[in-house]
């Protein structure tokens, strides 16, 4: 009766785990950021949403943006849009934003014709810079 033996072992392990980890503690509670005190952002941190038009898709724009943002210690993300534009959200020292765009445009292929922007509240939980929409 192997099944009875395994069932007994499983029940025993389940009881042991329940005694160690109370049921009210969820496995991913550490991800509930709203329940934790947010990290303190450096003074002057800004988050900005950019909608960028021009020759910005199929030319390495997103990867150049990621490289530049990481080099400048900025966080955020970049994503291609269906209308041919690119959306870029960047957070950090706003004095570095012009250099970010200068680094992105150091390409024979990227041509920015229009940039629309709006300020957003900073996200204290954000870490790193990602390329969305592979």
Annotate each PLM feature.
Residues 1-13:
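Extreme N-terminal basic, low-complexity initiation segments
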Residues 14-134:
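Intrinsically disordered, low-complexity, mixed-charge
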